Amino acid sequence: MNLLSQFMKPKNKFSIENLRYLHNTLKKNQIITAQNKNLIVESLRQIAEVMIWGDQHDNLFFDFFLEKNIMGFFIQFLAQKTSTEVTIQLLQTLSILVENLRNENSIYFLLSNNYINEIIIHKFDFSSEEVLDYFVSLLKALSLKLDKSTVNFFFNHVEKDFPLYTEAIKFVNHKETMIRIAIRTLTLNIFKVENKEMREYIINSTAVPYFSNIVWFIRRNCMSLSKVLEKSNHDSSYQLKDYMDELTDQFYYLHDIFNLGFESMNIVLAEQFIQYLIYPVFIGSLIDPLKNPDLEDRITPTLALYLLAHVFNIFSFKPLLDTISSALLTATQSQAQLFTSATTAPPPLSTIASNRRHYNSFRRFSSFPNLESLEAMKNDGITSISDTDGRIGASGRLLNNTSTDEDSPPNSGFKPSNSVQSTSSSPSTPKKYQQQFSRLFGSSRKPLPTTPSSSPKPSTTSSITTSTTTTTPTTTITTTTTTTTTTITPSSSPSKQNLSSSIESTNSLNNNNNNNNNNTTANNDNLESTQPKEDNLPTITVLNLNSPNENSTKDDNNNNNNNNNNNNNNNNNNNNNTTPTPSTPTRKRFKFNRNEFKESLLHLIGSDRETFGIVIMLYSFLKNQHIDKRILEKGGMLPYRLALLEGLLSPETNNNNSNNNHHHHHHHHHHHSKTTVTSPNNQQQQQQVSHSTGGIKGQKNSKMSASLPINIGHNRSRSESHAKSLLFNPNLYDTVTLEERSLFKTPSPGSSSLFGELEIETNKTDEGGDEKDEYDDGDDESSVNIRIKSSKHNSINSSVDSTIDLSKNNNNNNNNNNNNENNNNDNNNENNNVNNNNNINNNNNEESEEEEFVPVPESSQKDFTRRLINALFMVLVNSNQFRLVTLQMTLLILKELVYSSDSSSKLTETQALLLEQAYITVTDNLKECLSGPLSEVFLEIFEEELRSYKQIIFESLMEDVSLILPIPQKPVSRLSLSHRLPSGELERTQKAVQQFLVLRELKFTLLRKKDTMLPLKQPPTPMVKEKYLFNLETGVVESSYDIIEYHHFEKVSGPTPPPPSGTPRKRFTHYGVLFHNLLLAVDPPPSISSSSSSSASTSGSGTPNSSIGGTGGGGGGGMGSGTGGTSSPNPSNIIGGTNNKGIYGTIVHIAPLQRLEIETSHRDPSILRVTSHPTTWNVEMVFDDSTQCSKAKQMLERVRDDVRATKMRQIYALLGEKDPDDDSVPPQLNYGNMVERNPTNSDHDSNTTLNNEHNLLSSNNNGEFSTSMSNTPPSRVITPIDTSNSHPLANILGSDDNISFVNNNNNNSNNNNTKKTTSTVNTPISTPHKLKKGNRGSSSNSSLNDSILPTLEDHLRKTVSPKVDMFNTSFFDDTLDLKELISTDELNNGNNNNNNEDNNENPFSNIKRNSNEVKVGQPVQQEIEKEKEKENIIGEDVEKETSIEQKEIKKDENDNNNIVEKEEEEIKDDNIKEEIKQDDSNNKEINNDNSTTNNKEDEEEEIKKDNKDEENIVNIEHINEKEVQEQQTEEQVEEIIKESVDIKVESDNN
């Protein structure tokens, strides 16, 4: 059976027998031929399936797999190289096994021998893409199984062989994207494994060639991206985006490597990244091509800035960022040489093999201190990085080339790796390596322990020469590139000190010695090209870790500084003797300027494209939290980090200490300045100096940063005296340069602070010294005053000078100043000046106490910072030339530079003027748009832009590479407005609004003010939602909202056939309620809707029944009609009883009044179309006649215009302008009294519960619902409330309230009318409307009949003096209080015209004055009697006047009714004419054969038409006659009023 089983395929696929069968198949077919090729492929595929099943179920499978050595057959098949199919299947089988094995023992079984390594190093034919894909997939699968134990299966620590890694990295730059991604994943998995021997192998053997090739590949991609950028446009930017995505992926891959914590490898990677990419490409491309002609790979400045922004945005490795930041802000000569030096491609990775011997040929670039030198420095007790041949490292530090390899040239940048592999390079060495690197780059300020020693030992690995003196040894460190000599003389008594303190003191010493050497070698022509002008954090520092007592060191140093100046030439000779010079000197390309990068930035600010690159680079640079803040301070990018500056810049401190500072500075500037170092003998003197130069109040020994200026205070310097002249100076950025003074910090022993006691360097600061050499042409004169290099100063515009003089405003008394808004209000209310001045002054006092902006002196900002901020403000001044995205990023970068959350913004006077000028510019632009062709829709544009305005998201901005493309001249559909310039009036208006919002935000932020005018204020409105119930019947309570009753035709939906001709369409009654600033579409109860649908006449007489469940009514509005209106109301749902006052309609839509579109239908003038924007709700309001339609249109348009005018007044006030449509100051709307009710008749107070806070429903039957109602009352009902003070029509409509009584209460007596009207005399009159139930016909049912009567308004305006407040009184009131009118008139005259008693416009002006005169000497009783007589006379006159007026009003009403009827007839005639024209056109097209009959009909119609025209002419004549009669009646009324007034005046005089 066993014999047969070997030849027969088992039925069970997952069994040992099947695995044995597959093994026998491979054994029989060990030589691949064309016949057995497919059989071998199938067998290999089945082996993978069986082994995976066995891994999860039975361990015997792997025992058999190892026993039969099946992996050996795999090696045999690979060695034949005859079939690609077998090779692919073999690699796939291995990948499946490695990926799916879960048992740890199975993985060990598979990897325990060297078969996997032999397969890895096999020479595959990678010309086949499938072979390469499966090979890389196998390598990636193996890397996923790596850990501390499994790595030993791949890495041979004896032979230093790691084939999995060395073979994989050859494909890191492959053209296939998926292969590159797989190799990145593999290398990251390998770097994660914490195996010391493996990491040592990687750092010593493959790190330099691997990382150099990666960075070179990124460099090639940058060049390709630059070429694509030049050819691309916004319509074809997809290829550009693909290149940028690939480049970003590469950056994130390097970022992931940095985050692994492989410290020594991170240093090598940073070194290659800087050497091949950052310095020569990114920074070198920003330097002027004339100064850098040898740069081969140059990209556009915009792309270089954009890529630098990505570097600062992605990377977080502190040493890397500190090195780049130092090179950008304070570049040394060595760094500048790397900016302009040409680099060659590194050796390819294809030369790397699995044999260890091949790795020795690679030489790593030794710009960083290598492991051997660190170990030597540890043994010698001296930490020193110096260069014996003057070569420069990639990071700008001096290189340590101690190689003894004779094959290496003197200036070679590579070092043989055999020195790195010495026994001193232990796995623990990289930590020391990183500590040394971090210390030199300023990444750590923690003190490190030092080893005490009596004297340093000489070392052969460093260029340190030791000389002895009689007392103490002196260690002299020489550097040929800087031509300076720094001598440190340690004391014999050892002591420990903080490393950070050593760095600070050494930096100060090096800076002072450099200054001294500059003075002694001023005649040297090559000085500026060889001498660094500023102490730089990454610059080489010479430290003695066995530091003895610091005090004696500093004393000796002070004594040796003078000898250093006199013996400088001798020291240089010694340097030449002890240090070999380079064999090939570097050719001088241009005059070295350490601020070359900063000058390039300032030069590029001007065009939109380059400015955008600068602002995103600076923002990414400043927002990176991993950059050492000291570098930013020294470079002028972070001048206000310490809160201590607030106390130093206070005017009080400056006034007390300015004279002392001046005297002290001249005392220390007699000769070449130098830093005085703290010692026990001069501690007291130092404290006095520190105290005299300023500090925090109440503290004698203030400790300050070196970045603080020495001119502390508010005295105006010479640069500030002409600050205004710089505003419109075309050479704004080059006219002023400052030589700043700063206070240097010197560490003191035992001090726990980061900074030592205060010391003064009176000649130069970190940047000031350089600026002196650069701008002042070597002038060495010492002066406290700030010097200016400017030969011409343009005068500032006088208008701006008078408008924006911030310095004067700071010293003026706030009690005498009023802001522009208050002044405008005072001009409109001249009579209230005395009363308002105190309030305005008090408000100004409160604002000034909260925050007062005080410009900082020019000296508080470094030259580069000041010029950069001024340039960015000039971008805002010329904001029309820049895109919105550039302006928004400029806003963010200015906030980073000058804004402080703890104190006022650090703006100089010039910068404050530029800010104000920019704000005035954008405000003027917006004013032009406000009066432009889009003025009618300006409010909508402004609100939409304000709604969409938001802060920019920097991360999303960095992902949009199209922003660095040339700005398109034509609009691009896929490009938003913020990313391009506007095209057309609409886009220009939108951009003007956005510009205004950006500048307003910046201004109020920097000045620390709260914007109280944005967003625009909305009038408070009670919350209303759809499906709420609205009380349409208010009973006897006089409400102040308007109701428009209209009809809506039933919509035919579905396959229902249209009704036969002549059949009237069903229509339903609906209501439009003008509720505050909203139009509510309300469905009435089914009873009203059904009754109105039966006919166009009125619903039944009496009080209609209303259903609480009104939601079943018609559809209402434009929502369609409901089915409830067509059926008879259900008696069970009807509220019975005669006392039922509530009629509840359902709100079906809420439309803002501001954006209503109102138009009359062209088909029927009695139909009004109302559309609500931005929603799609629309409705066709059908009225009984065209007159009602026109009145409804007039009302809606007037209300809409009032709502819009309210917001437009806010916009005008925002721009500092007066509304041109507002001739007088309107009464302010009182939005606070939202729940007040109009006074009502006392007879109905017991039947209403509107004042109850807990009952929002209008009650019936004394506050209770009838038993016929539903068990559950409505959950939410909107009860009409008094909105007379907030309704837009409150100030327009005068006496419609009384008209409603005239029209709808004919059956009532006049006494009842007078009782009702007297209760509303003193309240603003609106247009309350109830549901009309009269029997005057369908036209009288509509509330529109009582809405607006233009003729009556004109009549009232003519008959009554303008000084009488028509909105607070009513001439239809039978009990009009004339005395109240007279007193109100006189009061208004006193307030508005400065109590001018000679004003004759008001006929009642003399009445009150004469009536109040009291003759001296008359008894009081007689006066009282006369007053009573006067009152009686006045009362009689008033009654006569009111009766006359009522008669005239009735006549006017009749005339108006006649006019309305005539207008209806005219409209009908017009409709008939239009129908005739339409019929004519239709008849001509349809019936051409029946021309004779048509002509007859036309003749008849023409005859009818002529007849109607004649009738119309007669009607017009009647109308003219009536108009003449009306004018006569008006004149009569005026004469009567005048006569009555004269009578009253005479009676008063008598």
UniProtKB/Swiss-Prot annotation:
Q: Where is the composition biased (Acidic residues)?
A: 768-782
**Pfam families per the record?**
CLEC16A_C, FPL
Where is it found, in Gene Ontology cellular component terms?
Golgi apparatus
**Annotated region described as Disordered, given as residue ranges:** 382-588, 653-723, 744-859, 1086-1137, 1236-1283, 1301-1347, 1386-1513
Signal peptide (residue range): none
Ranges where the FPL domain occurs: 44-191
Matches recorded under InterPro entries: ARM-type_fold, CLEC16A/TT9, CLEC16A/TT9_C, CLEC16A/TT9_N
- Extract the SUPFAM superfamilies matched here: ARM repeat (SSF48371)
Which segments show compositional bias classed as Gly residues?
Answer: 1109-1125
Q: Which UniProt keywords apply?
A: Autophagy
- Low complexity: which segments have biased composition? 415-436, 451-529, 558-585, 785-799, 809-845, 1088-1108, 1247-1262, 1302-1323, 1336-1347, 1388-1397
Which residues fall in a compositionally biased region of kind Basic residues?
A: 661-674
GO BP annotations listed = autophagy; endosomal transport; regulation of autophagosome maturation; vacuolar transport
List the biased-composition ranges (Basic and acidic residues): 1423-1433, 1440-1454, 1469-1487, 1502-1511
Which residue stretches does the UniProt record annotate as biased composition, category Polar residues? 538-551, 689-705, 1263-1274
Family, according to the entry, reads as follows: Belongs to the CLEC16A/gop-1 family.
Q: What does this protein do?
A: Regulator of mitophagy.
Protein name from the UniProt record: Protein CLEC16A homolog
Q: Which organism is it from?
A: Dictyostelium discoideum
User: What's the source species' lineage?
Assistant: Eukaryota, Amoebozoa, Evosea, Eumycetozoa, Dictyostelia
